[in-house]
């Protein structure tokens, strides 16, 4: 891949995994306020213990390939266990895992911001997501396609229709199929796509959502009424196969083909933890109209630590989405300005690039995120990220902290910059998240 300085923001969102998608660069002066709401889900179990182990562990690995990001921050551009090998889309942009559907095995993207499990069907129609014109199947860059057999049972009178924030669209049929993930087999409702406008990666054949069932994209054909069903994670815990919890840890030092972390179903990942867990309620943040409603796992934070002082203006009831699909942390703009001004030499925001450009040899100030009474410090390595090459062939770097806009006008995210430093526990049953510093 070749990056000009003008393509930095594309690199942030998709890194080595992007296709020819063309994101609109964030312009601070031209934001449209988002319509959002926040709710706290009801707990239905007691919190799991901080030592809960499980055999259902998915190993994350990294590859260099192309495929766009379906992350929370994509909305800011105003367009949009057992053991299995997982694929990480470069610098924490996304993850994929191996899953058995019927008698076939596929790689699917893991997405904490959606609920559906879907794969593309053989013979599907590929369209350009922008022009909506039919193109060759190879343009969608899917992995192997699903061929339904006798174990797949289509639900008559229902269909699936999905639109992502970056303009991708898919539609197809709904049905049930035997699905095995990390050694656990369930009969699961899935979407089978006949029509796709997709920025693929050449590896994955679909996507697996881990969010709440309210995000399911199934509808009745007669009056287009939403039809809710359990995502695969909920199916597993409602059948008593796992506890209602999943967790994630990322490894910044992973190279291509090596372990980049773990996603664990029903417990904690098999890694060492520094100190104790800090707890905070899960807040479901709903973002309307881009082009559908999006619900994300979100939390409140206590503030941001910078050097020997704290920045309480980062808190005050502001919701931060926990999103492994976003490379950077996105703070309210005044907070991001303060953190980036503390680099030596300072990082400078470039409006065209939508990023703070920083000297690749700069020194980052001590910086941490304060949650649940604890401060989780960011490794300096995660504060300066490669930005490709400029038009003159010079190496460029960008800050791990970006501007998310003014409060009420943007989306704030704790992404890979934060998540590479913690073990993150999504305790859905107790309606809380827990974080501990990773060793």
Swiss-Prot record:
One of its GO terms (biological process) is proteolysis. Residues 31-50 are annotated as: Disordered. Its main location: secreted. InterPro entries: Aspartic_peptidase_A1 (IPR001461), Aspartic_peptidase_AS (IPR001969), Pepsin-like_dom (IPR034164), PEPTIDASE_A1 (IPR033121), Peptidase_aspartic_dom_sf (IPR021109). One of its GO terms (molecular function) is aspartic-type endopeptidase activity. One of its GO terms (cellular component) is fungal-type vacuole. Residues 95-436 form the Peptidase A1 domain. It is found in: Secreted. Residues 32-45 have a biased composition (Low complexity). SUPFAM superfamilies: Acid proteases (SSF50630). It comes from the Eukaryota. Residues 1-20 form the signal peptide. The active site is at residues 111, 323. Pfam families: Asp. Keywords: Aspartyl protease, Glycoprotein, Hydrolase, Protease, Secreted, Signal, Virulence. It is an enzyme of class 3 (hydrolase). Glycans are attached at residues 103, 149, 178, 187, 253, 256, 276, 308, 361, 394. The keyword Hydrolase applies. Its EC number is 3.4.23.-. Belongs to the peptidase A1 family. Probable aspartic-type endopeptidase which contributes to virulence. PANTHER family: BETA-SITE APP-CLEAVING ENZYME, ISOFORM A-RELATED, ENDOPEPTIDASE, PUTATIVE (AFU_ORTHOLOGUE AFUA_3G01220)-RELATED. This is Probable aspartic-type endopeptidase AFUA_3G01220. It comes from Aspergillus fumigatus (strain ATCC MYA-4609 / CBS 101355 / FGSC A1100 / Af293) (Neosartorya fumigata).
